[in-house]
Amino acid sequence: MIKRVKTGIPGMDEILHGGIPERNVVLLSGGPGTGKSIFSQQFLWNGLQMGEPGIYVALEEHPVQVRQNMAQFGWDVRKYEEEGLFAMVDAFTAGIGKSKEYEKYIVHDLTDIREFIDVLRTAVKDIGAKRLVVDSVTTLYINKPAMARSIVMQLKRVLAGLGVTSIFVSQISVGERGFGGPGVEHGVDGIIRLDLDEIDGELKRSLIVWKMRGTSHSMRRHPFDITDKGIIVYPDKVLKRKAVIELE
């Protein structure tokens, strides 16, 4: 039997037929405003409620801002940080020189993937982390897209070896096909894509599981909502996107 990690996101584990297989690295890709950060933060918070320590690697926002964003949903991680069950890795303020005063785990040079991996490894071992989020992994290869797959593979090898189940947030531009970064989809175990589509003059949220190693899963596109308590997915509903006809 494959051990599974429950996302705890209402409706999501049904779509994944029980949860994410343990040690999988999942690419969570989507355009701006699709709910990627909320999804990944909810995954970590739910892990804490199940007694599974977690790590959030902040590359897009200041760790202080991340804590505030999470608290808006009622996910106050500070208590867990004090208890050594949750850790924030600051890979955002690299180069500003302010970080040392606040954060325990800091990445100083984002171009040095070995340093990045060393900081993650230390944090994982310190708190016995079971879940980890990198938000966003795209930042690591934004200036060197040819390195995307290699970087993802290096991270995956280390994190899976440490027994961690990970979500890598991946940014794509509006309307872009694919999952962000050349070849990254081949370097991960799972892909969940979040979309925001205009249907009949209204923006609708939906997600689809493109692949998930070690489990069967729903092959349909399911609608979801972002509420004041986080994301709710509707496994019994299917969203049909209007076909876009391209004229010659």
Curated annotation (Swiss-Prot):
Report the sequence similarity comment from the record.
Belongs to the UPF0273 family.
Keyword Isomerase tagged: no
Q: Has the keyword Nucleotide-binding been applied to this entry? A: yes
Coiled-coil stretches noted in the UniProt entry, renumbered to this chain: none
What's the name of the protein?
UPF0273 protein TK1590
**CDD domains in the cross-refs:** KaiC_arch
The GO molecular function terms of this record are: ATP binding
Sorted keywords for this record are: ATP-binding, Nucleotide-binding
Pfam families per UniProt: ATPase
PANTHER family assigned: UPF0273 PROTEIN TM_0370
Q: Which domain of life is it from?
A: Archaea
Residues that, per the record, bind ATP: G30, G31, P32, G33, T34, G35, K36, S37
Q: Where is the KaiC domain?
A: 3-247
